Amino acid sequence: MVSGVSRNAARTSSGCIVALVSTDDDYTSQDVTTIPQAIRFPSSCLVTYSCVSCYLAIPSGKLHAASSFEHVLECTVAPVSEYVKSVFVGSSIECTGRSGSVTFALV
């Protein structure tokens, strides 16, 4: 997948910012701050999107596994970290962490 601009949040057409996490390892229910490839943005918003295979960063700071679904997520996450790369292209958001990438397609 294509990596984008480091330290830039991926914004939807409505201006919302999403939080994404790669699925290269099993991080289910662990705190976001303990996960090296957590993709985190300093804002909160309501975003509707479909996810093929990924983890979601939710308000509680926990991660929940997901595998092909559509979901409305209200996210409040930690400040963006220096190792995150993300890019918003057309109707999808591609993000790259230290050990993998994930693409979210906006619904």
From Swiss-Prot:
Keyword terms: 2Fe-2S, Electron transport, Hydrogenosome, Iron, Iron-sulfur, Metal-binding, Transport
Keyword set includes Cell division: no
Location of the protein in the cell: Hydrogenosome
Co-factor remark: Binds 1 [2Fe-2S] cluster.
Positions of the propeptide removed during maturation: 1-8
One GO term describing the cellular component: hydrogenosome
UniProt KW Metal-binding keyword: yes
Necessary cofactors: [2Fe-2S] cluster
GO MF assignments: 2 iron, 2 sulfur cluster binding; metal ion binding
Major location category of this protein: other
Residues annotated for [2Fe-2S] cluster binding in this entry: 45, 51, 54
Described purpose of this protein according to its UniProt entry: Ferredoxins are iron-sulfur proteins that transfer electrons in a wide variety of metabolic reactions.
Protein name: Ferredoxin
Organism: Psalteriomonas lanterna
Organismal lineage: Eukaryota, Discoba, Heterolobosea, Tetramitia, Eutetramitia
